[in-house]
Curated annotation (Swiss-Prot):
The active site is at E291. Substrate binds at S179, A227, H228, Y282, P289, Q290, E291, R292, G412, G413. It comes from the Eukaryota. This is Long-chain specific acyl-CoA dehydrogenase, mitochondrial. It comes from Sus scrofa. Pathway: Lipid metabolism; mitochondrial fatty acid beta-oxidation. GO terms for cellular component: cytoplasm; mitochondrial matrix; mitochondrion.
């Protein structure tokens, strides 16, 4: 069993002994090591490639890959039927040190760098197992608490979330408000020092298993604009009036619990307010670039997985007396796919480097999300086609990857909204 890396100790996993995770101050790139980039690598999913990583990252990646191979892949089909992963998996991930990686140690996180967090994103994509909501929990929900929470909130939630004993979700989307966050109708009204929360949310990842949910709510309808009247609240499972409606049945991400949530006169103490009153929209705008970068990373990594899966298939599948890989049209398609994926990988890695040093702008994150998620769907379509009829069979990994890809251009802000944000930056007079 793994012992989680803490303050100078060693990480143990399956006999593998690794130093503590790299931090931005210690090691955030290859440091002069000779490393192949994706176009020159034997496989796009190889360990030890790409200059943004170091040998320390490689050791960590080996342990993460082993975790997904041993603890996730064997059970994922079962979780797809259940519509959720087991809580036991969350605690195993916590013990392995896969949660809260990029959250500071002083807050109760692991204290690793962004690249270490990205390794978990990538390895989950390479496993083709979309059920565990680790990335949303660790790299979307936890940063809100770490960045805007009070000392009391941080101490209460972050250590338990890092251990996998408290599962986090964030509730933005409503039946009538998706990409338009200013259209939120869920509201919280003051009642003495408390707040009374009413409304509903939908399409909430980790919603069914969640122990704490960050809820976006209107707190000032008289504000000069909707953006100036939104606040964030920490709502805990079991609070009176907080009801989880049902797990939603999706065409993809079948093992990922996605729920609708209802709030009927939920009484929240003043301590449930996250950050300052009416500053919620500002906090959302600050954190959305990381969410969009995460989606881009998952998208290009899934594309790398699909390419390798398809390359292996066409080299084995025979037609017209030879393997499909020897048909020129197939070779040309593989050449196109690898080129598009490698170009996108270079851009997304560049965005990771910018974000590690807090220099990733919203427009660039929007470009990465838009481009990589479109690529993922294009790659999925072509890879299914190269599999022929077998690509349409659920037992083939490419079929799962195909349906899982479709939501990527939708959540985190639709790609149409991404283009609006990119265009706004282009035409804006600075």
């Amino acid at each position: 069993m793994a012992t989680r890396l803490l303050r100078g100790s060693l990480r143990l996993w399956g006999g593998l002994c690794a130093p503590r995770l790299p931090t931005a101050s210690r090691c955030s790139h290859s440091g002069g090591e000779e490393r192949l980039e994706s176009p020159s690598a034997k496989k796009l999913t190889d360990i030890g490639i790409r200059r943004i990583f170091s040998s320390e990252h490689d050791i960590f990646r080996e342990s993460v890959r082993k975790f997904f191979q041993e603890e996730v892949i064997p059970h994922h089909a079962e979780w797809e039927k259940a519509g959720e992963v087991s809580r036991e998996l969350w605690e195993k991930a916590g013990k392995q040190g896969l949660l809260g990686i990029n959250i500071a140690e002083r807050h109760g996180g692991i204290g690793g760098d962004l690249y270490s967090a990205a390794i978990v994103w990538e390895e989950q994509a390479y496993s083709n197992c979309t059920g565990p909501g680790f990335s949303l929990h660790s790299d979307i929900v936890m940063p809100y608490i770490a960045n805007y929470g009070s000392e009391e909130q941080i101490k209460h939630f972050i250590p338990q979330m890092t251990a996998g004993k408290c599962i986090g979700a964030i509730a933005m989307t409503e039946p009538g408000a998706g990409s338009d966050l200013q259209g939120v109708r869920t509201n919280a009204k003051k009642d003495g020092s408390d707040w009374i929360l009413n409304g509903s949310k939908v399409f909430i990842t980790n919603g069914w298993l969640s122990d704490v949910v960050i809820v976006v709510a209107v707190t000032n309808r008289e504000a000069r604009s909707p953006a100036h009247g939104i606040s964030l609240f920490l709502v805990e499972n079991g609070m009176k009036g907080f009801v989880k409606g049902r797990k939603l049945h999706k065409i993809g991400l079948k093992a990922q619990d996605t729920a609708e949530l209802f709030f009927e006169d939920v009484r929240l103490p003043a301590s449930a307010l996250l950050g300052e009153e009416n500053k919620g929209f500002y906090y959302l705008m600050q954190e959305l670039p990381q969410e969009r970068l995460l989606i881009a990373e998952l998208a290009v990594s899934a594309s790398e997985f699909m390419f390798e899966e398809t390359r292996n298939y066409v080299k084995q599948r025979k037609a017209f007396g030879k393997t499909v890989a020897h048909i020129q049209t197939v070779q040309h398609k593989l050449a196109e796919l690898k080129t598009h994926i490698c170009v996108t990988r270079a851009f997304v890695d560049s965005c990771l480097q910018l974000h590690e040093t807090k220099r990733l702008e919203s427009a660039a994150a929007s470009m990465a999300k838009y481009w990589a998620s479109e690529l993922q769907n294009s790659v999925a379509y072509d890879c299914v086609q190269l599999h022929g009829g077998w690509g349409y069979m659920w037992e083939y990994p490419i079929a799962r990857a195909y349906v899982d890809a479709r939501v990527q251009p939708i959540y985190g802000g639709t790609n149409e909204i991404m283009k609006e944000l990119i265009a706004r930056e282009i035409v804006h007079d600075k």
